[in-house]
Amino acid sequence: MKYYSSFGFHDFVICCGYKGHVIKEYFADYYLHRSDVTFDFSAENRMTVHQNVAEPWRVTLVDTGLNTQTGGRVKRVQKYIGDERFMLTYGDGVSDIDLSALLAQHEASGKTVTLTGIQPGGRFGVLDLDESGGTVTGFREKAKEDGGWINGGFMVMEPEIFQYLTDDTCILERTPLESLAIESKLGIYKHNGFWQCMDTQRDRSKLEMLWGSGHAPWMRETV
């Protein structure tokens, strides 16, 4: 969220699932988590917050179910998004992607969805591209490491996407995106910089080490 905010995007809708109440409690007490606080338990029973930590955010937390698939979760928050273009990302990946450039390419392309393509290791499925290299034509699951592009998240979507989302069983990365690829409505923004997901303990250790160094690639000042 801080990374998006550093590009001027401050309105967030979070699709909550497992332990969504913990996320709600975190934001309810956000200023307590981020500030020094004095609790005076004398007769006055007073609490003093020594820093007023403020973010330029508007955050909507939506319970989208425990077992709902990715497409179903997006469908459930449609009423909070309305008919606006929006960005979508997963909660387990970080990058130094230029979000402004991603948005600009999407706007110029006329695609329904533009996803960010990255080239990590070989444990991911890859994307098939057309001759121009700017349109996704299909998906190949669990291919060997061959320099192919994968979906790194960090997507831009037009409200038309909701026409492709059905119910809680809908997997965004399957029928909806595959249908858009067949219709030449799925674009790709190629990112050659830093990208890392956190799927394993090893991934977590790597990211925590980068963060602890004070030079994590995804660190930016909030606008």
Sequence positions of predicted segments:
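Short acidic-glycine loop/turn motifs at beta-strand connectors
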Residues: 129-135
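Extracellular glycan-interaction surfaces
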Residues: 116
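Catalytic-core segments of class I nucleotidyltransferases/pyrophosphorylases
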Residues: 85-87, 94-107, 119-122, 135-223
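Residue-level detector of conserved, well-ordered beta-strand and adjacent loop positions
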Residues: 62, 130, 140
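Residues at the starts of beta-strands that form the adenosine-phosphate
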Residues: 10-12, 112-113, 185
